[in-house]
Amino acid sequence: MGESRAWLLLVMLAAQAFDVSPGHAQQRPRAREIGVAPGIYATGPLNAITDVPGVLVGQVTVIEADSVRTGITAILPHAGNLFLQRVPAAIVVGNGFGKLLGSTQVNELGELETPILLTCTLCVWKAADAMIEWMLGQPGMDKVRSINAVVGETNDGYELNIAIRSRPITAAQVRQALTSAHTGPVQEGSVGAGTGTRAFDWKGGIGTSSRKIPSTVGPYTVGVLVQTNFGGVLQIMGAPVGQELAHKVAESGSRAHADGSIMMVVATDAPLSDRNLKRLASRALMGLARTGSVASNGSGDYVIAFSTAPDVRRTRDAPRLTTTEMGNTEQLSSLYQAVIEATEEAIYNSLFKATTMSSKGGTVEAISIDKVREILARYGIKPK
């Protein structure tokens, strides 16, 4: 074998050893495609957070050599300048072992004035700096002297993103996530901020889902996007999948695997005040619990909820956010049901669409769809 062929073979073997391509995610099914359809409400056309009118999502996956597996996910409530056209918002903390930049001002004033960025733990401040620079360059921002950047994170620095200390994202990548944000389908699994994450000791990632509440009490849509990187004992539609597959992270004794975090972003076109958005956000934690999470001591479990309804936005010069309150308690209860269902399914999608990922620090396996099907069938859940 010649030197050139030998070198080519070594390169190919190395590529296989560290196969990090997210392309295989498109070949893995979403939860609903194998019959896992939590709840009673119908999904939107895309079954994604982008079913909520106006919401855009942009993602950049950062994979470098054998030690960087991370990325950025950007969620924009609308396509305009959020600083000049703010939306009502609220944040709920399930367990506060995390870094959610900008959270105190959001809960104090009840509004978002920037897009939401998700990334890895040590990249939060670089992401915020880049987003602020990007926003200051927008038209009408020449006299702005304060911006409350909202950036969430999970810690992917154990096996996959072992170069996390280098804070391996750039301002250009943050700008790319923001400027490439679009409506339509949202890529899931080992992409964007979910590139290096793990959940229930399998490969985690980005997941999304939506629900439409009935026209008799709406019609409104609730969409959820999650970045999963947490522990627990996985349950799917009540079936003890984690126990059946001997993935009992809560009993593993490994803090790195038992702890972790999840970021949950909730969007709705219902014209809710920040007070009612906080009530909506708190129900997302119920969807999280349905999947087997216990919000462990070292977990950062956060929910950011916002409304895209145009008539509840606040312009920068307006004295306060005016909100058309939903006085119908049946409407609110339907929204609560919807967000629980969408959160649960978004978490399943993050697992099902994730692909096995390797780095110099190790390998995190994707959950076996075939084994999940077999377990669900055994527990009376008819998978496709």
Residue ranges and their predicted role:
Residues M1-L8, A17:
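Bacterial N-terminal signal peptides that target proteins for export
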Residues A15-A17, P22-Q27:
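Boundary at the C-terminal end of the N-terminal hydrophobic targeting segment
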